Amino acid sequence: MNKKGHVLNAILLAIGLAYILRPSGDVETFVTMAELFVPLVLGALFPDVDTAFGRHRKTLHNLPVLAVVLAYPIYFGNLQYVWIGVATHYLLDVLGSKRGIALFYPLLDTEYGLPIGVTTSSRWADTLTVVITLAELAALALVQVFLVDLATGTPRDAVATVLAGLPV
């Protein structure tokens, strides 16, 4: 995917995730949409910073970088949705492009992708981006309903019960 595809994904995610978090469709939904926009776009564009240095789709396109970004909310509360932008960037590059990404870099240089991807110049790139974004939103909705409140990070009751039963 290219920058346009990643920004399209982030904009659609901000709209969809706002309705997942605040489904009322009132002012609160639109405020949430505005609050989500910057961290999602930031996260969606961050992995491509490695085009200016390092090895593109390796240096900032891997699981160790995602783990660091997942830890952002612990230290920087206003960046709690950046990880979603980064994770969906990875998904777009794995599912939506022919090349894939080096998920296990720097341990392995192997790039992982699926054969359904298209070239960034393909006329189908935007369509595939929208389809992948809809799947991402469906997955985020399931996480929100069944696993964790994405706005607060609080586990749902069933998950909390399972976690409470684990030996410490």
What are these regions (language model features)?
Residues 1-168:
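N-terminal membrane-targeting hydrophobic helices
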